């Protein structure tokens, strides 16, 4: 395995993938910042691969999942995640020899569900959010291109990706537990799938030899209770408090009320409450058939907690 193109090498997962493969392979990064080998804003331009030949593409670049507040933010999901993917492939099409394999970091958001237990790859993908829609469009485009050009396509549908210096919801939880502001709701019963970044990275050599769509999880699907208490234990035994579902509903209604009458977006509302209290887990048994053996986030906190 040699000559790898990586997009999104400055991102949370992309940077870790770049560092892992750059020690033993000729890796070429594509992105907007000046430290990339090929400098290109994929959302607006087609990259030029002059005298660069590669066997594998690992496409990590993308706009992360947030709740868009403006139409501009909605449009950015399509521009970065879908148009950016099309531009990348247009650039690849211009080289004399196409790569043998293409790995795309997608998301479980393509399923379009907020609640469910052990959802597998056969579940119909009907994304509802701009983020999920843009990822599904990118998936379809890549898969069709791969079939047309005899390139192995592997799509990773990932839940929350965790690791050192996390972003998003996990960072929010850790920061609030540190400050003593975190509260579990309804005893933190809801379970969510997640996956360690290091496990995804170490599995990529296997994925390069395969093709298809794979859910990747840690197989533990921790509850908010388990996760929050593990974090608290590792942060000087901080105490994690709990509020009842009844009280949480009252707070959520207040958030709804403020937005309805004053158009002020509150950090907690009924939609947020539903997501926090609903279990959402994914089945990774398809990946296990080709050698996926992840670490459990609950038993290996040293891999993602400082």
Pin down the residues of each PLM region.
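Flexible, glycine-rich beta-alpha linker
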Residues: 111-112, 154-172
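Conserved Rossmann-fold NAD(P)-dependent oxidoreductase catalytic core, especially the SDR/UDP-sugar
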Residues: 87-130
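NAD(P)H-binding glycine-rich loop region in Rossmannoid oxidoreductase-like domains
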Residues: 36, 42-80, 87
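Substrate-positioning beta->alpha
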Residues: 166-172, 186-211, 215
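N-terminal Rossmann NAD(P)H-binding glycine-rich loop of SDR-like oxidoreductase domains
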Residues: 4-22
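Mid/C-terminal beta-alpha module of Rossmann-like enzyme folds, strongest
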Residues: 207-267, 303-306
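Amphipathic terminal alpha-helices
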Residues: 282-306
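Active-site Tyr-X1-5-Lys
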Residues: 128-154
């Amino acid at each position: 395995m040699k000559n790898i193109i990586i997009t999104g090498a400055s991102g949370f997962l992309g940077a870790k993938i770049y560092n892992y493969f750059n020690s033993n392979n000729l890796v070429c990064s594509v992105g907007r910042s000046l430290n990339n080998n090929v400098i290109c804003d994929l959302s607006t331009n087609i990259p030029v691969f002059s005298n660069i030949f590669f066997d594998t593409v690992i496409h990590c670049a993308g706009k992360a999942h947030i709740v868009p507040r403006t139409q501009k933010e909605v449009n950015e999901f399509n521009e970065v995640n879908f148009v950016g993917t099309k531009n990348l492939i247009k650039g690849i099409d211009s080289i004399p020899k196409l790569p043998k394999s293409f790995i795309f970091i997608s998301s479980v958001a393509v399923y379009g569900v907020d609640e469910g237990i052990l959802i597998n790859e056969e579940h119909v993908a009907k994304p509802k959010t701009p983020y999920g829609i843009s990822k599904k469009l990118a998936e379809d485009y890549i898969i069709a291109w791969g079939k047309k050009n005899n390139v192995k396509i592997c799509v990773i549908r990932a839940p929350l990706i965790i690791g050192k210096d996390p972003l998003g919801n996990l960072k929010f939880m850790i920061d609030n537990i540190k400050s003593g502001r975190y509260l579990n709701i309804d005893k933190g019963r809801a379970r969510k799938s997640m996956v360690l970044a290091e496990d995804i990275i170490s599995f990529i050599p296997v994925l390069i030899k395969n093709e298809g769509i794979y859910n990747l999880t840690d197989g533990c699907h921790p509850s908010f209770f388990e996760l929050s208490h593990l974090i608290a234990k590792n942060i000087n035994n901080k105490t994690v408090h709990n509020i009842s579902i009844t009280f949480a509903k009252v707070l959520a209604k207040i958030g709804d009320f403020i937005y309805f009458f004053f158009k002020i977006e509150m950090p907690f509302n009924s939609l947020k409450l539903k997501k926090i209290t609903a279990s959402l887990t994914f089945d990774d048994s398809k990946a296990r058939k080709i050698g996926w053996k992840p670490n459990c986030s609950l038993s290996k906190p040293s891999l993602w907690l400082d």
